[in-house]
Amino acid sequence: MESYFPSGAIANHSFIRASSPASTPLSPPTQRSNALSNRLTSVLSASYADSDIRDALETLSLRGVHNTAETRRQLRLDVQKEVVECNAEIVRDFGKVAEQLQRIGTVISSLNQTCEEMRQHIVRAKQDTAPVIEEASALMNQKKESETKQQLLDAFVKHFIVSEDDLLVLTSAEEPIDDRFFNVLDRVKQVHHDCEVLLGGENQRLGLELMEKSSRNLNSAYQKLFRWIQKKFKSLNLEDPRISSSIRRALRVLAERPSLFHSCLDFFADARDYALSDAFHYALTDTVSGSGGDRNVKPIEFSAHDPLRYVGDMLAWVHSTTVSEREALEALFVADGEEIAKGIQAGLSSEPWSRIDEGEEVSFDGRKALNDLVNRDLVGVSRALRQRIELVIQGHDEPVTCYKVVHLLSFYRATFSRLLGTKSNLADMMQTLEKFTFSRFESLMLEQVNTLSNDHAALTPPDDLSAPEFFLDALEELTSLMKTHDASLEAEDAESESTAENKFTPVLRVAFDPFLQLAKSSAAELPDATARAIYTTNVLLTARSTISAFAFASATHMDPISTALSSLRMELLEIQHRYLLDASGLGVLLTALEPFAPSPTISKPESEGKDGHAPPQVDKQPTDIAEIADLPAFQPEALIAVGQQLDDFLPSALMDATDNLKHLQSASFVQSVTEEAVEAFCRDFEFVEGMIIGADEARGRVHIKRMEDGSDAGVQDDVATESGKVSDGDEQESKLRRLFPRTTGEIRVLLS
């Protein structure tokens, strides 16, 4: 923006302010000088930041005004001139507008006059045509009413009246069941339903007559449909996977009459029951109602000598037939299940007597209906199957085969439960046959046990004390049973259980526990306790090795066997310990030392702890320990004899001890028992050694005391020195220690 002040204005202003105080001959008077000064001060003090001043300056800048002296003098005049010119132009424009408004007013007046004339003409015309229009309106209304009545009549006839041709298609037995039949049936059902609307009017006669007629036609149509379905069911080939769509549609429609629908299903079930029973008889004997069959396929009866194969073939045939029957009927009840359910629900309203329980809501389950129908189709087959399985099981005496049949029945029970439901006839029959076969298995095992109980020769333990032959045979049978169970689906459930009973536990109770009890009770035939313990241990070890390979058997029977083996191990440990004491002669010394022991006799096995070790020694000894040397067993001749017996025993001690349990069939078991018995023997020897040393020291103290008291001089050969200790020379060699020189360290080395 250009400045409105000349470039020299500021300098001139400074010059004026600087020179104003000076007095010159040419300067104006003082009053004028003050006025100018005030004016300048006012101008200079004005704020050019004011918006009004800024807008005014911008307006001047847009007009192209230059800040000159001439412009400043003419500025007011120029502005006033422009204002006058603008006002004059506005006045001229308003004059033109006034002229146009006058012309518009003239036109409007002319239009008003014309409209008034037209209004008068219209009034006169209306007065002239009013009678004609009224007459025409009355005629039009009459025509409209007539057309409406005709339309209603046509619609009523079209909707509620069924032609004779259609009724003939619906009720005549000569007419086929096709799409036209179903279309006419749908129309009659709609007419019957719509008659309810007619019953809501004042005149109900027409509605009642139409409803009665439609009801008769519907009943005739459903009867015709029922007979047609029965006829089709007689010739229905379920082997053909493509069941006629007309049959499926007919069943959906017939479901609206529940009584006819269920009668139709009953007829179908009876027909299929006869057909499947005949087919099963054909599969068994290769003849159907006396007619010849295919010679290339062997009848199932050919394998009747093998119960497992015979039962398996029959069950396989029944399963295959059940699957085929279910797949063939699935299109009828699963694919169209919703439509059938709707039809049954609608039919219950027309047949209220079909309800068994009025308060119960009836719903159709297609899969349940399918399973029920398949069950009914197989009633005859199930009856024949049960009779044959019961006969073949009753005539068979092999327990393992019976148990395999039990598992076969269990497998098919689970299969039929998944296929037809847990409450199906086939599943129930499989469960009944499973219980029957297992009862037969139990009776066979009980017969074996009773036979063995009366066979004294079979119960006699072998000379080598191994498990008896009958028990090995029973374990072999049990192994076959466990392998059969392990290969089945039920074994998976047993693996998840720890000590709880599983499905194999009843088998162990009849096929294992009685034979184990017989084997254990037969040990009473042995007169020797060692032989009885070894024999019983061999029996339990054999049993444990048999059931340990199967988790479901170990879950319930391993702990009792392990507990019994632990008890027998303690008994064998005591036997080995007693053998070492008797063979070495150390038992005589331990028996003699019983009164001097700080606790009950150490040498007796009963004094040992549960681990077979002797009780810990007590440092405190009886005060009369010196009297040990006076005992008969510790006299020189007897003690020397015991020492000699010990020396003769030690070189072959381990071999002899192992040979003492040579009939025990587990080498590791023999080794562990012998090692613990040797350890107990070493502790006993350490006790005897300590008692001998203690007796020598006690006798030495007694002799020293006697010398100090001036006692008898006849024992001065054994007097101690002045220091109170027994001499280490020839005098000490005459003590008990000299007669029994073996040390515990030597014993441990020789027995290691």
Swiss-Prot record:
Gene field: cog6
SMART domains per record: COG6
Pfam families attached to this UniProt entry: COG6_C, COG6_N
Subcellular location: Golgi apparatus membrane
Keywords: Golgi apparatus, Membrane, Protein transport, Transport
Composition-biased stretches (Basic and acidic residues): 725-736
GO cellular component, one term: Golgi membrane
Primary location group: Golgi
InterPro entries on file: COG6 (IPR010490), COG6_C (IPR048369), COG6_N (IPR048368)
Organism this protein belongs to: Aspergillus fumigatus (strain ATCC MYA-4609 / CBS 101355 / FGSC A1100 / Af293) (Neosartorya fumigata)
Family according to the record: Belongs to the COG6 family.
Protein name: Conserved oligomeric Golgi complex subunit 6
Disordered, as annotated region: 600-620, 709-736
PANTHER family for this protein: COMPONENT OF OLIGOMERIC GOLGI COMPLEX 6 (PTHR21506), CONSERVED OLIGOMERIC GOLGI COMPLEX SUBUNIT 6 (PTHR21506:SF0)
Topology in membrane: Peripheral membrane protein
Role noted for this protein: Acts as a component of the peripheral membrane COG complex that is involved in intra-Golgi protein trafficking. COG is located at the cis-Golgi, and regulates tethering of retrograde intra-Golgi vesicles and possibly a number of other membrane trafficking events.
Biological processes, Gene Ontology terms: intra-Golgi vesicle-mediated transport; protein transport
